[in-house]
A protein has these predicted regions:
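Short hydrophobic, aromatic-rich alpha-helical segments embedded in or entering the lipid bilayer
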Residues: 37-45, 215-253
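Hydrophobic alpha-helical transmembrane segments of multi-pass membrane transport proteins
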Residues: 85-157
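Hydrophobic alpha-helical transmembrane segments of multi-pass membrane transport/permease proteins
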Residues: 55-81, 86-101, 202-208, 260
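Alpha-helical transmembrane segments and their short interhelical loops
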Residues: 128-129, 133-200, 248-259, 264-266
Length: 279
């Protein structure tokens, strides 16, 4: 039995095999990469989503636009002009946004959650808000050409003035933010992928029925339900722009409601993403 002097056993002289790797600091933990800032991370997610959906973009735009143009052609035999024509054209144009931003984004996040794809995003050093906002912005941007084509075709079909169609530059992003946030929240909160798809389809159907049909002909309970739908205020803002002298204060108020709903819905979607990613 050999004796070892106390001086020979110094702190750190005895190391286990599992602790023999080089240490980068005093606590032995390797430093992690710093979390990316919100705006650069958002831009990266946005570009990645655009690249991922590039192949499906043309068919997607065709389906969404063809659907809205077909609805306007069908309604042309029923509606002659006036407020009803404005409602049909504005509702059909915003329907393109609802088809993509609400319906398809709900399906995308529902599929991502069901397949475990959220685990991939959870490993990236990006803020949860960047994932949600980047995907929402990418899906909403898909709708710009289709919405513009639908508005121009509808204006020509019903003889509406096109002088103020520039308001689409505000209607599309604001209503897109509100509907995309709602779609992302539905997809992330739905317990099953099938329910996420169903919620997206029901939301798009509500945007169709409550947006295209003139509000004056709706029963009171349906009119109240219409007021709760975020796309309604984008439809109202666009419909008012077809007037000879639009009331821009009311248009701005409608767009302000879209913006407020967009902030709330995207915040809920970000919370839902955090909740789903840690499960």
């Amino acid at each position: 039995m050999s004796a070892v002097s106390a001086e020979a056993v110094t702190p750190g002289a005895v190391r286990s095999g599992s602790d023999s790797r080089p240490r980068s600091g005093g606590d032995g933990a390797a430093p992690l990469a710093p979390r990316a800032k919100l705006l650069p991370a958002l831009a990266a997610v946005y570009r990645a989503q655009l690249s991922r959906a590039r192949v499906a973009r043309i068919p997607l735009l065709f389906v969404a636009t063809f659907q809205s143009v077909g609805i306007m052609i069908m309604m042309r035999g029923v509606v002659d002009g006036g407020d009803e024509a404005r409602a049909v054209v504005a509702g059909s144009s915003v329907l393109v946004v609802a088809f993509v931003a609400l319906n398809l984004l709900a399906q995308y996040f529902g599929q991502l959650r069901a397949s475990g794809g959220l685990d991939h995003y959870a490993t990236l050093p990006v803020p949860p808000a960047a994932v949600v906002l980047g995907a929402a912005a990418a899906y909403a941007s898909f709708t710009v050409p289709g919405t513009a084509v639908t508005a121009v075709v509808g204006s020509a079909l019903f003889g509406l003035p096109m002088a103020h169609l520039w308001v689409l530059a505000a209607v599309v992003p604001l209503s897109g933010a509100a509907l995309a946030g709602l779609g992302a929240a539905l997809g992330l909160l739905a317990p099953r992928q099938e329910l996420a798809t169903l919620c997206g389809q029901l939301g798009m159907s509500a945007a169709l029925l409550l947006g295209v049909l003139p509000a004056a002909h709706m029963p009171a309970p349906i009119a109240y339900a219409r007021d709760l739908l975020p796309s309604t205020y984008g439809v109202e803002a666009l419909a008012r722009s077809f007037d000879a002298r639009p009331d821009w204060a009311v248009v701005a108020a409608d767009l302000g409601v879209c913006a407020a709903v967009g902030v709330v819905s995207l915040a809920v979607a970000t919370w839902a993403y955090r909740r789903a990613a840690v499960r």
